[in-house]
């Protein structure tokens, strides 16, 4: 897919939540930003404003519909000198679904379900958590969205989506993507088959 992607994509992971701090798997649960997360969203908006300057008006803005991404998008847009909305939302940009594991920590899962935790560790890209989805399934969900992009786009989404983008657009091997660190308060730029953090 990277060979066919000619636009520039600015990826922002949502700001911090209390579940991030606690190490809980959020998945598709609707968890709000905490104070630090709101500060991160505003800071990344200022970074984008300075980085993009006159090109801001040419961007398409799209977010996952979950609360933490909508909040992040609104705050960063205000920091960029834009109204908090409107911006588009797309269900395909929701976080990877962890199913029955949502709300739990990896430590708890490893303790209570060691066999399933080991199965996931053996194939992090292809493993499907109970009632959830794999990274491979998430990749199939976001491919049509990527193919639909017509111009440079700023997207606010989730760590799992960023890992899939690293594989589809940034040349990362699927086996490496599930453990790639995806930071909050920074911008991941995809362009010409490569990815770089700003």
Language-model regions, residue ranges each:
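Generic beta-sheet signal
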Residues: 9, 59, 151-160
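Domain-level recognition of soluble alpha/beta enzyme cores
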Residues: 172-198
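Active-site signature of alpha/beta-hydrolase-fold catalytic machinery across serine-
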Residues: 75, 164-168
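Short active-site segment of divalent metal-dependent hydrolases/proteases
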Residues: 17, 161-162
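Phosphate-handling substructures
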Residues: 22, 78-141, 179, 191, ...
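Alpha-helix C-terminal capping segments
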Residues: 143-151, 190
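Active-site-proximal alpha-helix that buttresses catalytic centers in soluble enzyme cores
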Residues: 4-7, 16-82, 133
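General small-molecule cofactor/ligand-binding pocket signal
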Residues: 10, 62, 88-90
């Amino acid at each position: 897919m990277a060979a066919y992607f000619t636009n520039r994509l600015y990826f922002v992971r949502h700001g911090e939540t209390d579940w991030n701090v606690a190490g809980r798997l959020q998945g598709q649960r609707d968890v709000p930003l905490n104070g630090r997360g709101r500060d991160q969203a505003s800071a990344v908006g200022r970074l984008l404003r300075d980085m993009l300057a006159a090109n801001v008006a040419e961007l398409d803005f799209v977010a996952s519909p979950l609360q933490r991404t909508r909040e992040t998008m609104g705050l960063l847009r205000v920091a960029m000198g834009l109204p908090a909305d409107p911006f588009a939302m797309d269900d395909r940009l929701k976080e990877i679904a962890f199913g029955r594991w949502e709300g739990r920590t990896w430590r708890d899962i490893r303790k209570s379900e060691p066999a399933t935790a080991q199965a996931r560790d053996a194939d992090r890209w292809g493993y499907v958590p109970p009632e959830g989805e794999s990274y491979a399934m998430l990749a199939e969900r976001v491919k049509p969205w990527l193919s639909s992009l017509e111009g440079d786009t700023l997207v606010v989404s989730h760590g799992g989506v960023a890992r899939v983008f690293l594989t589809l657009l940034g040349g990362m091997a699927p086996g490496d993507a599930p453990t790639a660190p995806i930071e909050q308060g920074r911008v991941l730029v995809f362009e010409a088959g490569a990815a770089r953090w700003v």
